[in-house]
Amino acid sequence: RFKKIRRLGALPGLTSKRPRSGSDLKNQLRSGKRSQYRIRLEEKQKLRFHYGLTERQLLKYVHIAGKAKGSTGRVLLQLLEMRLDNILFRLGMASTIPGARQLVNHRHILVNGHIVDILSYRSKPRDIITTKDNQRSKALIQNYLAWSPHEELPNHLTMDPFQYKGLVNQIIDSKWIGLKINELLVVEYYSRQT
């Protein structure tokens, strides 16, 4: 993980650690001139590692985004941001996306009153995300909520920390994306691969 954040910069979904300021200078001095291919590859890797996707999963999302109306890059980011594991991370119910994945895999999360154990579940507006009604599930979420830095919630989400309940209000707006990335470079990377 630390090699990845040193090479690619801060990835809040992967870890809360940040690269040291001195390591950035060393990377720039060592790397020399960066080719266009390398720049596109690094942007793609940033996206992949932040959301914890395999190459194949990311390629599938790029194809879905390409078929949808609108800007492919913007639709791609919306698809990734509306995944259940990412929604839990953005609500503060988990400190990282891998932590959110564990909550989903161990069946601690309910969506609209039903247990969902599919990480890639695509959240929709008016989805209500809660924990199971047992002590262990609530203790896990309470622990994450107590220790997570209280950042401003994106406007497409609402959180009630006392009832351990989150609400998806709408599809995410592009200015609330949690990662500094040029999505057009990712789309370019994949368009040149085919």
Swiss-Prot record:
**Keyword Chloroplast tagged:** yes
Major place of residence: plastid
* Originating organism: Iris ensata
How does it associate, per the subunit comment? Part of the 30S ribosomal subunit. Contacts protein S5. The interaction surface between S4 and S5 is involved in control of translational fidelity.
Return one Gene Ontology term, BP aspect: ribosomal small subunit biogenesis
Domain S4 RNA-binding residue range list: 82-143
Identify the CDD domains for this entry: S4
Bilayer-spanning residue ranges: none
- Write down the HAMAP family for this protein, in alphabetical order: Ribosomal_uS4_B
Q: Which Gene3D superfamilies match?
A: Ribosomal Protein S4 Delta 41, Chain A, domain 1, RNA-binding S4 domain
Q: Name which cysteines form disulfide bonds.
A: none
Please give the SUPFAM superfamilies that the UniProt record associates with this protein. Answer: Alpha-L RNA-binding motif
InterPro entries (UniProt xref)? Ribosomal_uS4 (IPR022801), Ribosomal_uS4_bac-type (IPR005709), Ribosomal_uS4_CS (IPR018079), Ribosomal_uS4_N (IPR001912), S4_RNA-bd (IPR002942), S4_RNA-bd_sf (IPR036986)
Q: Can you supply one Gene Ontology CC term for this chain's record?
A: small ribosomal subunit
Q: What is this protein called?
A: Small ribosomal subunit protein uS4c
UniProt record similarity statement: Belongs to the universal ribosomal protein uS4 family.
Function, as annotated: One of the primary rRNA binding proteins, it binds directly to 16S rRNA where it nucleates assembly of the body of the 30S subunit. With S5 and S12 plays an important role in translational accuracy.
Q: Which UniProt keywords apply?
A: Chloroplast, Plastid, Ribonucleoprotein, Ribosomal protein, RNA-binding, rRNA-binding
Keyword Transferase applies: no
Location relative to the cell: Plastid, Chloroplast
Q: Which GO terms describe its molecular function?
A: rRNA binding; structural constituent of ribosome
